[in-house]
């Protein structure tokens, strides 16, 4: 049986770090320690760890999305490339895409803060997430052998952040009515972001300005999407990925 381990670290009620692993019972202690070591340097005053058995049989897929690395001179050039990819994938007019991306860079919650989850945007350019503060979060996904995948990616010059991002966005793109994704971190000093489509994870540097504490995700979906089913799949369906899409 597989177990889901979720960790959330915060300070003064503000979210600092989070992570999830899906492992067999004999790997629980090791996974908890790994998640704790990731959160501890951020000096949280509260850490919550939740461990629960996964009742539903995980969907096992062969590989993650293929990685395409893009490096530009500045974040404006990077976002121009992101716009071109998103326009091709979604059909949404560039001006509306710019407005949506600007929201992520300035705070996409109604009060101008960062959303806790992702925006959901249909092909009409409409925001359709059920809660504009909470958004939607993708959970219950991991690589079958995470340590092996991390070693492969590090050898190619990537980081553990790439493992986490690639894992989440690969699950997202499994959903038939998910078209594309845009993501930047809310950490001020982390400027690499990504755009994903059905085939590729475009890792783009820099996708935001250094020092900007805003960030978030946009999930682009078809107009015909069943929102309740989409939420259930992303938040509850267990997915395990065997390999990573690099040469």
Swiss-Prot record:
It catalyses: heptanedioate + ATP + CoA = 6-carboxyhexanoyl-CoA + AMP + diphosphate. It comes from the Bacteria. Pathway: Metabolic intermediate metabolism; pimeloyl-CoA biosynthesis; pimeloyl-CoA from pimelate: step 1/1. Signal peptide: none annotated. GO terms for molecular function: 6-carboxyhexanoate-CoA ligase activity; ATP binding; magnesium ion binding. Its cofactor is Mg(2+). The keyword Magnesium applies. The keyword Hydrolase does not apply. GO terms for biological process: biotin biosynthetic process. Its EC number is 6.2.1.14. Keywords: ATP-binding, Biotin biosynthesis, Ligase, Magnesium, Nucleotide-binding. Belongs to the BioW family. Catalyzes the transformation of pimelate into pimeloyl-CoA with concomitant hydrolysis of ATP to AMP. NCBIfam families: bioW (TIGR01204), PRK01322.1 (NF002360). Homodimer. This is 6-carboxyhexanoate--CoA ligase. The lineage of its organism: Bacteria, Pseudomonadati, Aquificota, Aquificia, Aquificales. The gene is bioW.
């Amino acid at each position: 049986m597989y177990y889901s381990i979720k960790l959330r670290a915060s300070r003064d009620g503000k979210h600092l770090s989070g992570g999830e692993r899906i492992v067999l019972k004999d790997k629980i202690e090791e996974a908890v320690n790994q998640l704790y070591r990731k959160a501890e340097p951020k000096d949280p005053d509260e850490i919550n760890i939740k461990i629960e058995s996964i009742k539903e049989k995980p969907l096992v897929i062969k590989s993650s999305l293929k990685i395409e690395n893009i490096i530009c001179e500045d974040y404006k050039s990077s976002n121009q490339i992101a716009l071109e990819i998103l326009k091709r994938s979604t059909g949404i007019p560039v001006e509306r895409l710019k407005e949506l991306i600007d929201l992520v860079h300035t705070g996409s919650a109604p009060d101008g803060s960062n959303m806790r989850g992702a925006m959901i945007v249909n092909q009409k350019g409409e925001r359709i997430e059920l809660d504009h503060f909470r958004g939607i979060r993708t959970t219950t996904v991991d690589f079958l052998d995470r340590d092996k995948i991390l070693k492969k990616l590090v050898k190619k010059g990537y980081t553990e952040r790439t493992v986490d991002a690639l894992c989440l966005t690969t699950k997202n793109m499994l959903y038939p009515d998910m078209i594309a994704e845009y993501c930047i971190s809310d950490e001020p000093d982390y400027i690499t972001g990504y755009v994903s489509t059905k085939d590729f994870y475009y890792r783009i540097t820099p996708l935001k300005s250094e020092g900007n504490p805003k960030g978030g995700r946009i999930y682009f979906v078809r107009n015909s999407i069943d929102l309740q089913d989409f939420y259930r799949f992303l938040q509850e369906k267990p997915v395990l990925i065997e390999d990573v899409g690099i040469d």
